[in-house]
């Protein structure tokens, strides 16, 4: 069968295989499969079960719903998960022996997360509760007249949501599985995050900041709580982002991941272990100059829930690590030994490890495979493919294999990837599109990226790079962008373009395009304001004015401080690094794409840029996406994701 080129509509053909979770017996597992439904314009997911000895896969849940975070009871006889089948996220449990899943909660605001009690008779969970109410409150106040909202803190907005509900806090409770009776464990007017439950069922680790003013407080202390007495032991109280807690098998050690604000929010994450016997904490990964976790970005994967760490019975810890475009599984011992457990040039976006560390279950994507489930023997590296959800689609389409490139810009080494157009013919010349990722502390890597394949299928070469500010190349490299927006990162991108123009004679340098989102949108705006070498540009969810961003974005006031190293007391610096200042220089036709419920990079940024360019008589158009937030390209409504890609390809087709 002759293969066809990738199409925008293939978003509906590929499936996202994620979240493998081994049963306590290590002989079976569950995982989640998510797909886009064209008719309902929705995402639906289902839990699947696999017998590892036979490879038999069985679908366990059905219906038009999303399910997430399946977890086994300690005896392996029950499986709990969160589902939105009743509109709000609630907790459900099903028997391994069979039968329909049963709802355990009916909380007014839904639930966020949960952990089994090892006794198997109750489940701990967290969720939002309004002041004066409990998890058992079921009455919704209908027909209430609109009321003014009094805001007294600076962190009062969230992406898509907008203004956050007032007097609502995340609390922790538990539900009796037999009776569905729900009990409240916390009630203080602070947000409580459920992190972990000990294997003996006597302790919780929760995260809670009890400071009343958190405008400039970025701590979320980890607290060890005795369930019976509610006595607390502080594990960590430091400015930064920490979590993903896991008890060792004997409960002596408590592992967690995260980072302090040494380099603001671009500090590389590490794996820490707290020893209950002496109250000491060790950093297991301090010697690795790369971030713990998955920093790779793509537009295909859904619900990529991966544990921060997994303990084995011999007190080894397994975790993800992002480096040089790879996301690999690593292992560490308490005496400091660290080694990779998987290979290079792939994206291990989900995993679980057998108790005896004999094997791991992995969900893995590559540049030409959206992802499947695998079993890998730890000692030998031998790998067996367990699922084939995307196999039929892969048989139908011709994917382009990106080529890894390395180049230098002065003393800076930069990695990137170059894709030739589909159906490339030697001797012909083609237009090239430069893609720029957001963050800026993110990482392009060895993973499937639908947008890149679509552009190649449309006849474009694609160049995507990890310039300064990207994760995966050292702490100094990712930190280099702070205080230098539009500086070294811009130069790295231009140097990468110059490099491929020098080495690849198929690129038509008179037909260059550029696009990017978030920081990539900022950089797109900056580029067209500082060079006219591009013939078309598409800026997405972008920033053009740091002065207004400071007060309008939900992260504005601290992000500008951390990244621009300036605030409203240094307006000149904010304006000098604002692309809007250079709007008069823009000669490149610019398409502006923005989501209306983006509160990270608010749509007012796009509005300012559009009106300014129109007023100056520049070639520009503005497309607004309703009911969409900052994550439109990844998790937006399917029809709008399709429309977005059509807008991008249509603009480049018009001008290139």
Question: Which sequence ranges carry the predicted segments?
Answer:
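Predominantly five- to eight-bladed beta-propeller fold
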Residues: 45, 128-175, 209, 220, ...
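Short, solvent-exposed loop/turn segments at conserved positions within beta-propeller repeat blades
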Residues: 39-44, 85-89, 163-168, 214-220, ...
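A short beta-strand motif characteristic of beta-propeller blades
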Residues: 6-10, 58-61, 102-105, 181-186, ...
């Amino acid at each position: 069968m002759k293969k066809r080129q990738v199409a925008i509509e293939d978003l509906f053909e590929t499936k996202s295989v994620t979240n493998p979770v081994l049963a306590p017996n290590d002989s079976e597992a569950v995982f989640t499969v998510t797909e886009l439904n064209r008719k309902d314009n929705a995402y639906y997911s289902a839990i699947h079960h696999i017998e590892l000895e036979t490879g038999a896969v069985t679908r366990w849940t059905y219906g038009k719903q999303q399910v997430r975070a399946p977890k086994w009871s300690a005896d392996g006889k029950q499986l709990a998960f969160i589902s939105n089948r009743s509109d709000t996220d609630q907790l459900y449990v099903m028997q391994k022996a069979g039968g329909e899943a049963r709802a355990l909660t009916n909380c007014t605001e839904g639930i966020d997360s949960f952990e089994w009690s090892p006794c198997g008779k109750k489940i701990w969970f967290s969720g939002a509760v309004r002041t004066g109410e409990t998890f058992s409150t079921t009455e919704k106040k209908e027909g209430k007249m609109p009321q003014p909202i009094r805001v007294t803190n600076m962190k009062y907005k969230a992406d898509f949501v907008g203004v956050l509900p007032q007097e609502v806090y995340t609390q922790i409770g538990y539900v009796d599985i037999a009776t569905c009776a729900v009990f409240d464990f916390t009630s203080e007017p602070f947000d409580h995050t459920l992190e972990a439950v000990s294997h003996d069922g006597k302790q919780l680790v929760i995260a809670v900041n009890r400071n009343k003013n958190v405008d400039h407080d970025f701590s979320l202390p980890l607290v060890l709580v005795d369930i019976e007495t509610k006595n607390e032991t502080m594990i960590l109280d430091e400015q930064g982002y920490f979590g993903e807690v896991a008890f060792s098998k004997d409960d002596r050690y408590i592992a967690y991941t995260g980072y302090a604000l040494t380099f603001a929010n671009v500090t590389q994450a590490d794996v820490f272990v707290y020893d209950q016997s002496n109250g000491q904490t060790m950093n297991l990964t301090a010697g690795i100059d790369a971030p713990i976790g998955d920093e790779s970005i793509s537009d295909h994967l859904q619900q990529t829930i991966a544990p921060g760490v997994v303990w084995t019975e011999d007190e080894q810890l397994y975790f993800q690590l992002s480096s040089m475009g790879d996301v690999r599984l690593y292992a560490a011992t308490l005496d400091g030994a660290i080694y990779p457990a998987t290979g290079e040039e792939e994206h291990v976006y989900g995993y679980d490890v057998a108790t005896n560390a004999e094997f791991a279950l992995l969900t893995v994507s590559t540049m030409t495979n959206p992802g499947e489930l695998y079993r890998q023997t730890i000692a030998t590296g031998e790998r067996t493919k367990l699922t084939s959800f995307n196999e039929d689609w892969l048989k139908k389409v011709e994917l382009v294999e990106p080529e890894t490139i390395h180049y230098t810009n002065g003393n800076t080494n930069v990695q990137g990837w170059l894709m030739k157009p589909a159906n490339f013919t030697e001797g012909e010349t083609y237009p090239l599109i430069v893609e720029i990722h957001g963050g800026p502390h993110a990482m392009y890597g060895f993973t499937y990226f639908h947008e890149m394949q679509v552009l190649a299928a449309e006849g474009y070469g694609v160049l995507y790079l990890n310039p300064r500010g990207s994760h995966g190349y050292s702490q100094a490299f990712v930190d280099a962008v702070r205080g230098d927006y539009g500086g070294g990162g811009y130069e790295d991108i231009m140097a990468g373009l110059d490099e491929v123009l020098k080495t690849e004679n198929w690129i038509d340098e008179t037909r260059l395009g550029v696009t990017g989102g978030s920081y990539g949108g900022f950089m797109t705006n900056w580029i067209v304001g500082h060079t006219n070498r591009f013939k078309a540009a598409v800026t997405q969810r972008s920033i053009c004015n740091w002065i207004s961003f400071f007060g309008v974005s939900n992260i504005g006031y601290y992000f500008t401080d951390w990244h621009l190293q300036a605030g409203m007391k240094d307006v000149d610096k904010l304006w000098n690094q604002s692309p809007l200042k250079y709007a008069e220089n823009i000669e490149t036709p610019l398409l502006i794409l923005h989501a209306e419920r983006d509160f990270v990079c608010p749509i007012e940024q796009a509005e300012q840029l559009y009106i300014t360019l129109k007023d100056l008589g520049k070639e520009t158009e503005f497309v607004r996406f309703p009911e969409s937030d900052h994550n439109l390209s990844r998790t937006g409504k399917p029809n709008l994701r399709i429309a977005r890609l059509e807008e991008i390809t249509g603009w480049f087709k018009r001008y290139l």
